[in-house]
Amino acid sequence: MLEFYGKRFESRLLLGTAQYPSPSILADAVRASLSRIVTVSLRRESGEARAGQDFWALIKALGVAVLPNTAGCHTPREALTTAHMAREVFGTNWIKLEVIGDTDTLQPDPFGLVEAARILCDEGFEVFPYMNDDLIVAERLIEAGCKVLMPWGAPIGSGRGLNNPYALKTMRAHFPDIPLVVDAGIGVPSHAAAAMELGFDAVLINTAVAKAGDPAAMARAFALAVEAGRLAYEADPIEARDMASPSTPLLGKAFL
């Protein structure tokens, strides 16, 4: 069972709530995904206050855990301010910490990320840092107090899947006891299954579901892929080989 900061969940699929065509389609997708955790962004525009209230009511009606994020923040100061606002609005110490370093690739800023993570952990937040796949950055985040890591598979919204499976596999081996979630870049269910087969604890999906022709059906497909990938990992799959290995034994075979 998936566990974050002492809370346990049956589903290993986390779902983002942005970019859906309508609130009802979002609700259908969340239900179809069987996800018990959704990420939400704090809306700061006062003109959208009523829309924000309706959205929050919808999320509460779904009965899922909420993971607020600091999407769009480019400095530690911005991220800290957003995190404090999110804690007040959503009533949770959880925060998905994003400090973006590049506007083209949306690659996280590792220096600002570690700085913000250290401050937030000291203030009692339970931090889920969106990071690259660098082991040293991961070490620094753990030292700062993070008990979950969320390395990217590929740039946000790119749908490219796992750009560097070797780095992700190495991270899994290096941190066997830290919950790891592939966050960003997943495009199709097979990408999610591949991440789970590497031993990752969960995946976070948003664009691949929200922008699909049928978001609810895609959410269900991802749920099945995540389950299949986890089962495959637990079943201890065979190692890839460069040469063939016969699957049919020669014992008992007639030689003519």
Curated annotation (Swiss-Prot):
Name the chemical reaction catalysed here.
Answer: [ThiS sulfur-carrier protein]-C-terminal-Gly-aminoethanethioate + 2-iminoacetate + 1-deoxy-D-xylulose 5-phosphate = [ThiS sulfur-carrier protein]-C-terminal Gly-Gly + 2-[(2R,5Z)-2-carboxy-4-methylthiazol-5(2H)-ylidene]ethyl phosphate + 2 H2O + H(+)
Question: Where is the protein localized?
Answer: Cytoplasm
A Pfam family it matches = ThiG
- What is this enzyme's EC? 2.8.1.10
Give a short account of what the protein does.
Catalyzes the rearrangement of 1-deoxy-D-xylulose 5-phosphate (DXP) to produce the thiazole phosphate moiety of thiamine. Sulfur is provided by the thiocarboxylate moiety of the carrier protein ThiS. In vitro, sulfur can be provided by H(2)S.
Family per UniProt? Belongs to the ThiG family.
Q: Could you identify this protein by its name?
A: Thiazole synthase
